[in-house]
Structure formats: C-alpha cells, structure tokens
UniProtKB/Swiss-Prot annotation:
It comes from the Eukaryota. The gene is C4bpa. This is C4b-binding protein. Disulfide bonds join C58-C103, C88-C115, C120-C160, C146-C176, C181-C223, C209-C240, C245-C287, C273-C299, C303-C343, C329-C355, C359-C400, C386-C413. Homoheptamer; not covalently linked. Mouse lacks the beta chain of C4BP.
Length: 469
C-alpha cells in the first residue's frame, strides 16, 4: 500500500531535501509514506497542491523590441501551451518569424517574433541637384540641394514616417529650377543682342555700338549667380565712345584738303607729297570705325629698283630726302667699286659695284710672282718667273677664274739639266755622254716631263680651236 502511493502520488526525492523545479518534475523532502502521521499527510497534500499550481505557469507577455502583444496585455500569468500573437509597432514590419510566443511547460516563453524598420521608396536622382542621406528606412531623413545656378523649389528635407499601414516620405520631393536674370542693362550709343525679358543661368548676350562709336570693354556679359542662387549679370556692360582718328602723319607728305583739329568716323583728307617724292597709294584717306585711317600712302623718291649684282646683294635705308643702298658680296667674293649708291630726286647716283671671285695666292717653288698678294680677284693675271737654274713646266701667265681657281694650272719650276744631258733631251743616244746611271735616270725623267708638257699644250690648242669654230 505504501509503495503504491509512493509511485502514484510522489515525485522523485530531491537532493538535500529541497524543493526543485526541473523541467516536468518537482521534488520535495520526505523519506517514505509507510510511516506518516496526520500532520505529515496534511503537509504532503498541501505541497502536492502547490506543485500543481506552480508547474506550467508563464509570467506576463515578454517585452520584445518594436513589437506588442495583440491581446491579453495586462495578464500576469498564462497556462502552459498558451500561444500569444504579437504585432509590429507602426513603421516596422515582420520578417520571416511566426510573430507569436509560446508558453512552454517549463514556464518559459518561447519567442518567435522579429520586427525590422520598413523602407521608404528610393528617392532616386534629383535633376540638377543632389540627394543626401545614409538610409531610407523608417525614421531616417534625407536632404535635397541644387547645383549652382539652380533654386530649390519645395522642402529641403523629407523624413520616412508612418503613412497608413506602411511608411512614406513626409514631404514631396522638390525641384531644382534654373535661376534667371532680368533684362541686361542698356548702354548709350549702343545696343545688346537680347530680346527676352528673362535670361537663364549661363546665357550670354553681346553689345555693339552705333556707327561713329567704338566699344570700350568686353562685348559679352553672361547671367551668373552669387551665393550659388542669386542671379546677377557677370560684369558691367561696355561703353561706346566716339571714334577719333589722330592727325595723319606721312613723311614728305602734307594735307591739302579736309584738315581738322579732330577727325571722327568717316572724315576724309586729301594728301600730297613734297621734296620731289612721289605718292605711293591713295591720295584720299578716311577715318575708319576702328579709329585708324584707311591705308596710309607713302611719299617716296621715285627711283627704279637699284641694280642687282651677281654674287652679291644690297640693303636700303630711307632718310628725310635721300635713299641709300649699300651693296655686299657673298662669301668668297670681293667688292670692286663703291659699296654705296644713292637715290635723290628720283635718280640713282653712282654705279653699282661688282662682286668678283677671290683666288688664293698661287704657291710656286723656286719662282717669283709678278704681283704678290694674299688674294686676287676674278680676271686678275699673274706672271711667274722661275729662279736661275730652274725651268718652267706649264704656262707662265695664269688668270683668276670666276670659280675662284687659277687657269691654266699654276706652273712648276724644275731644275734645269746639265750640258752633258742636253743630247738626252733631243732624243740622241745617251749612254756615251752620261757618266753614271743616276744621271741617266734623271735625264729620262726630264725627258718624260718634257713630253707631257708638249702633250698638254697640244690639247689646249685643240680645245681653243674647237671653241673658235
């Protein structure tokens, strides 16, 4: 009997005689039910009733971030296996959770609730402006701004807030509208190209002056902004001032009609030349719209072009009453004659010089020159005289050619043969007259040179004969 009651009514003994809650079992202190008295049995019965009351109870609904129970908010305890539904706070949405809590038999709440901030729609791009913000979730704020030259029309901020069952931006998105300048300023004696009442940012206009006036300053101004949004014209407009030409000043020239102390646009004068000069250009000139005279003439001494020279050139300088021309020669040529000629009263005075080629001094060994100089000019002749005991091989007279070389070639002075060797030069037998082999060799060399000279002379004569015919 005692064993049966122990199996049916009593839980397992608790260690150290204390009451414990351990999942689905409760234990309290007693040794056996075989020997119980009345008070002891009452105590055991009360404890069993208390165990039934405590086991499986959950406390108030748990506090979950951004969520609240859908019902039974004020209850403080719930039976085991109780299920409570939760709802997300406004501005938050459920994820993949079941959105409920469950009271487990152990008296603990099992939570399956998750709420996250909802997203407002992406604001996208703002034409001609900027959208700044870190997130677009519930509670966040974005700011709007415009590029330079544009004005923000609408609110500069918008917040993601609750709207009905969802979230939306608190303010409509603004626009960036281009700024416009008013009419450009007018100018005296001129006008601008604008025809509108208002001109958008970066739009420009140009100014022109009336006839007889010229523009001072930049002809262009544009619509711009200060502080990024205040429209202003970029600069002050130009001005138009009356066109004035200075007195025409022409060397050797004079105004014969139309003289004024001040000349304005389209005024004209007639000019003439003095001192025997001739007018080159138009006699009548006009004050132009740019403040300059139309092509000014010149008064020149009416000489033809100075004569050109071969292998040389000239430079000219015009003075008050005379024109001077200076001649110079190319490299390798020397000026022969006066280097300067002049034009006065339409006539050249003096003869143009010549540029003649330069030949270097001929080098002749064992001989002398008829005229010794470091350089010789074209067509200049030189005669060569061989020293005593030397015979000339070549032409005695040579001339400086236009190419700067001597013609014919510079001759040579060779040592004459002795009396004993003269028969060798005439072609006679030599061995009976020559004392030794050295003299024989020299005689043969001299004879060879003589033949070469004679051959050269024959060729020259032949060429001259050919040129003559």
């Amino acid at each position: 009997m005692c064993a049966k009651q122990q199996q049916t009514l009593l839980p397992t003994r608790a260690a150290h005689g204390r009451l414990h809650r351990n999942r689905d079992a409760v234990a309290w202190p007693f040794s056996t039910l075989c020997r119980v008295s009345g008070p002891t049995l009452f105590q055991m019965t009360f404890t069993a009733a208390l165990w039934v009351a405590v086991f499986g109870k959950c406390g108030p609904p748990p506090a979950i971030p951004n969520a609240l129970p859908a019902s039974d908010v004020n209850r403080t305890d719930f039976e085991s296996h109780t299920t409570l539904k939760y709802e997300c706070l406004p501005g938050y949405g459920r994820g993949i959770s079941r959105m409920m809590v469950y009271c487990k038999p152990s008296g603990e709440w099992e939570i399956s609730v998750s709420c996250a901030k909802k997203h407002c729609r992406n604001p996208g791009y703002l034409d001609n402006g900027y959208v700044n913000g870190e997130t677009i979730t519930f509670g966040s704020q974005i700011e709007f701004s415009c590029q330079e030259g544009f004005i923000l029309v609408g609110s500069s901020t918008s917040s993601c807030e609750v709207r009905g069952k969802g979230v939306a931006w608190s303010n409509p998105f603004p626009e960036c509208v281009i700024v416009k300048c008013g009419p450009p300023p007018d100018i005296s004696n001129g006008k601008h190209s604008g025809t509108e009442d208002f001109y958008p940012y970066n739009h420009g206009i140009s100014y022109t002056c009336d006839p007889g006036f010229r523009l001072v300053g930049s002809p262009f101004i544009g619509c711009t902004v200060v502080n990024k949004t205040v429209p202003v014209w970029s600069s002050s407009p130009p001005t138009c001032e009356k066109i004035i030409c200075s007195q025409p000043n022409i060397l050797h020239g004079v105004i014969v009609s139309g003289y004024k102390a001040t000349y304005t646009h389209r005024d004209s004068v007639r000019l003439a030349c003095l001192n025997g000069t001739v007018l080159r250009g138009r006699h009548v000139i006009e004050c132009q719209g740019n403040g300059n005279w139309s092509s000014l003439p010149t008064c020149e001494f009416d000489c033809d072009l100075p004569p050109a020279i071969v292998n040389g050139y000239y430079t000219s300088m015009v003075y008050s009453k005379i024109t001077l021309v200076t001649y110079e020669c190319d490299k390798g040529y020397r000026l022969v004659g006066k280097a300067i000629i002049s034009c006065s009263f339409s006539k050249w005075k003096g003869t143009a010089p010549q540029c003649k080629a330069l030949c270097q001094k001929p080098e002749v060994g064992n001989g002398t020159l008829s005229d010794e100089k470091d350089q010789y000019v074209e067509s200049e002749n030189v005669t060569i005289q061989c020293d005593s005991g030397f015979a000339m091989l070549g032409s005695q007279s040579i001339s400086c050619s236009e190419s700067g070389t001597w013609y014919p070639e510079v001759p040579r002075c060779e040592q004459e043969a002795s009396e004993d060797l003269k028969p060798a030069l005439t072609g006679n037998k030599t061995m009976q007259y020559v004392p030794n082999s050295h003299d024989v060799k020299m005689a043969l060399e001299i004879y060879k040179l003589t033949l070469e000279v004679e051959l050269l002379q024959l060729q020259i004569q032949k060429e001259k004969h050919t040129e003559a015919h």
